[in-house]
């Protein structure tokens, strides 16, 4: 975790920002909960447990800054709630998501399944793709299993 924090600190410094204690507390919460897709309120509640002096507005500002610097991605799964996801180190693209419409579970697909599609778009449309996001909405294997029982 400390290596990731050091890299994020360097990323902030390269854009003339500092990793303040408040920002570090927010980053640590994101790292500790990397498998989850936390809302700003979720992040705030977890930060508050360790650093009660940090306010909600500070957490919001920190998340917006981290989004702007591409340390995190701000995502919305169609439920009106923005969630924050740490960018995977070295990933050329944002990972994909499977969102269960029954239980709300969110699973991640790390593989870039759209390489062929990207090549066609770049070749035929002369469109230079910088990133993409793909979210599938359906019924997860856990809920699917319940239907057959």
Curated annotation (Swiss-Prot):
It comes from the Bacteria. The keyword Transcription regulation applies. SUPFAM superfamilies: Winged helix' DNA-binding domain. Residues 6-91 are annotated as: DNA-binding. Keywords: Cytoplasm, DNA-binding, Iron, Metal-binding, Repressor, Transcription, Transcription regulation, Zinc. Coiled coil: none annotated. It holds the Pfam family FUR. GO terms for molecular function: DNA-binding transcription factor activity; DNA-binding transcription repressor activity; transcription cis-regulatory region binding; zinc ion binding. Fe cation binds at residues 93, 95, 115, 132. Its main location: cytoplasm. It is found in: Cytoplasm. Zn(2+) binds at residues 37, 85, 97, 108. CDD domains: Fur_like (cd07153). Residues 92-147 are annotated as: Dimerization. Homodimer. Belongs to the Fur family. Iron uptake repressor. Acts on the transcription of ferri-siderophore uptake genes. This is Ferric uptake regulation protein. It comes from Bacillus subtilis (strain 168).
């Amino acid at each position: 975790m400390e290596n990731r924090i050091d890299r994020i600190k360097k990323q902030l410094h390269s854009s003339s920002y500092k990793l303040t204690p408040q920002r570090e507390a927010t980053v640590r919460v994101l790292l500790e909960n990397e498998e989850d897709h936390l809302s700003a309120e979720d992040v705030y509640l977890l930060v508050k447990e360790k650093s009660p002096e940090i306010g909600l507005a500070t957490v919001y500002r920190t998340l917006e800054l981290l989004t702007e610097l591409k340390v995190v991605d701000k995502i919305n799964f169609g439920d009106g709630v923005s969630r924050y996801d740490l960018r995977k180190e070295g990933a050329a693209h944002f990972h994909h998501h499977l969102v269960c419409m029954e239980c709300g579970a969110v699973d991640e697909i790390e593989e870039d399944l759209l390489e062929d599609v990207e090549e066609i778009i770049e070749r035929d449309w002369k469109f230079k793709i910088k990133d993409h996001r793909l979210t599938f909405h359906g019924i997860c294997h856990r809920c699917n299993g319940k239907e057959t029982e």
